[in-house]
Amino acid sequence: MRTRALIAAGCFFGLLGIVGLATPSFAGGDWNDVGIAWQPYDKGLAEAKEKKKPICLVFYTDWCPHCTNYSKVFHDPKVVEQSKSFVMIRLNKDENKELSSQYAPDGQYIPRTYFLSSGGTLDPSLHAPRDKYQYFYDESAPASILAGMESALKKLN
């Protein structure tokens, strides 16, 4: 009897572990911190001025499924390579409300990606090809953000 109870408990907790591993996590996504040199805001601004590099600024949250999906495009080898031409800054909107308000020409939706000059000035002409939510790049494929990065490099360098 005791053996059956132990086996049943082992099976129950084993299943809980399997279900836990199979459940998707929306804890902000994996933004490729190994391949991309993400910087905090103040340090990133200083680095951009010093190295005369444009800035790619991304706002996200930990609870946003679109942000989790968008984080995956930053694993693309072409995006990783292109990121080296920028100072990459990633900010959690919920933890940086004042900055999120400052960078919200068409709203505080997420994720939002902006391209700034090395001096930290937003160029409003550099945005995704859409009328609404202009700073929302396609979350499902890297082509959209790559096109944005290429345009930013041409205009801001």
Please give the residue ranges for each predicted region:
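Positively charged n-region of N-terminal signal peptides that target proteins for export
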Residues: 1-4
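Bacterial N-terminal signal peptides
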Residues: 9-20
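Boundary at the C-terminal end of the N-terminal hydrophobic targeting segment
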Residues: 21-27
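Thiol-based oxidoreductase modules, predominantly thioredoxin-like and allied folds used
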Residues: 35-39, 79-98
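A short beta-strand-turn-helix
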Residues: 37-53
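Short active-site neighborhood of thiol/selenol oxidoreductases, capturing the structured segment around
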Residues: 51-64
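Typically the conserved alpha-helix immediately C-terminal to a functionally engaged Cys/Sec
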Residues: 67-82
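Non-catalytic, surface beta->alpha helical segment in thiol-disulfide oxidoreductase systems
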Residues: 108-157
